Structure formats: structure tokens, C-alpha cells
Amino acid sequence: MAKKIVGFVKLQVPAGKANPSPPIGPALGQRGLNIMEFCKAFNAQTQGVEPGLPLPVVITAYADKSFTFIIKTPPAVTLIKKAIKLDKGSATPHTAKVGKITRAQLEEIAKTKMKDMTAADLDAAVRTIAGSARSMGVTVEGVV
């Protein structure tokens, strides 16, 4: 018989830097899950990833206090900022532009994000990522 799911916990955790402090500790503690076990497993799975890169993680909590988790790809905004070496997006995105991104850079980001996106093909994924870039105040080149 399958385990009974009692809930899901969605968090963004820096790669290799999971520790029991907030927000991880309280989120897992209220479900009765072993916080240190999660931290050790998460840090072990994210060893090959750039340290500190925020990764969305979905933790499935079961009735017997066990859990499983799925690590997703980094948020598009983080990948865009990394690609064009930007600290933060524009405060007024449609008036003040903070940088430029090319189609080649967008395709690279779209290939990374593709497994977590619902886009039908690479071109649709590129357009989605381009929309995220525009809403950050980044000028998009090569995408209509």
C-alpha cells in the first residue's frame, strides 16, 4: 500500500547551504519531519551545483513522518541575472532598462529550465524567458 501524503512544503534553498535555521526548520518542524536528515540529503544532492544558487525544492511529507523531495531548476530570474551579470532588476521595468540579453543567452537559459516548464518547444520556452527578462527591465534582442 502506498504511503499517505499529509502535505507538501515548497521552499527555495541555496545549493549546498541547507541548515535547520528559518525558513527550513519551522517549515519542516511543523510537519514533524527530521530537519537534519533533509539538510544532509539536500546538501549531498546539490554538491555539483554552484554553491549559493537558490533552488526550488518540493518536499512531500508522509503520515509516517518520512519525506521525499524533488529539486527543481533555478528560477529564470536568477539565471537571467547570472547570464548578464546583474545584481537586481529595474525598479521601473518599462522605463528604466538595466541591461541587454541576446537570443543565444535566452536559449541557453530555456534549455536549462525546459524540464520544469510547460512550453511545447524551445522557441516557446525562449519567449517565456524573454517575458521574464522584460519584466525585470532587461532589453531583449532577437525575440519578437
From Swiss-Prot:
Cross-referenced SMART domains: RL11 (SM00649)
Bilayer-crossing regions: none
SUPFAM superfamilies: Ribosomal L11/L12e N-terminal domain, Ribosomal protein L11, C-terminal domain
Annotated GO MF terms: large ribosomal subunit rRNA binding; structural constituent of ribosome
Post-translational modification: One or more lysine residues are methylated.
NCBIfam families associated with the record: L11_bact (TIGR01632)
Family: Belongs to the universal ribosomal protein uL11 family.
Its job: Forms part of the ribosomal stalk which helps the ribosome interact with GTP-bound translation factors.
Name this polypeptide is given: Large ribosomal subunit protein uL11
